């Protein structure tokens, strides 16, 4: 049986642990700041029509490097709070560098279909957000980020892709 001083010591350490754990969790939650969307300057990218495309227009071609630059800025201003700086997730939200990683072990025709499926998922998620049981897990960016900005962010993520 423990003496009174031993029980108080255990209770004291338990309170210290609980307090420190609470502070760490609070800092982690608040460390990502608010999620007020920031504008993304896309004037240097080829402008797209008002109809949403199903394929990333910046994945290949002369605008790819500029799209990566614009997308990096857009990602780090709007997405990094949850998905991690430079797209390296800290565990709060999915690591978007791995979004379509499973596609690249497939044969060519299956790979194209897989990439198209993930592009549709990405665009749908960014535009419409994600909620579950009334909780917002990702805010919708439709009407906030234009098509050029969203595809530039996707192009940036493609440049950061990893299979790990």
Where are these regions (language model features)?
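Gly/Gly-Pro-rich "capping" loops immediately C-terminal to redox-active cysteine motifs
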Residues: 68-72, 84, 88-127, 137
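Electrostatic cytochrome c docking/interface patches
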Residues: 33, 37-74
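N-terminal secretory signal peptides that target proteins for export/translocation
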Residues: 1-12
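Sec-dependent N-terminal signal peptides
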Residues: 10-23, 89
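N-terminal signal peptide c-region/cleavage motif recognized by signal peptidases
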Residues: 26-28
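Axial heme c-ligation environment in periplasmic c-type cytochrome domains
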Residues: 32-40, 90-99, 125-161
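The canonical Cys-X-X-Cys-His
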Residues: 71, 75-85, 138, 153-157
């Amino acid at each position: 049986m423990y003496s009174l001083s031993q029980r108080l010591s255990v209770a004291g350490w338990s309170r210290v642990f609980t307090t420190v754990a609470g502070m760490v969790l609070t800092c982690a939650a608040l460390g990502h700041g608010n999620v007020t969307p920031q504008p993304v300057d896309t004037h240097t990218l080829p402008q797209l029509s008002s109809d949403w495309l199903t394929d990333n227009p910046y994945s290949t071609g002369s605008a790819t490097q500029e799209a990566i630059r614009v997308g990096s800025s857009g990602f780090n201003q709007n997405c990094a709070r949850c998905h991690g700086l430079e797209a390296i997730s800290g565990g709060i939200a999915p690591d978007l560098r791995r979004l379509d990683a499973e596609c690249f072990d497939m044969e060519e025709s299956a790979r194209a279909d897989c990439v198209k499926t993930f592009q549709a998922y990405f665009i749908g998620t960014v535009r419409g957000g994600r909620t579950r049981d009334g909780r917002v897990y990702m805010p919708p960016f439709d009407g906030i980020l234009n098509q050029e900005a969203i595809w530039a962010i996707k192009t940036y993520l493609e440049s950061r892709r990893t299979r790990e």
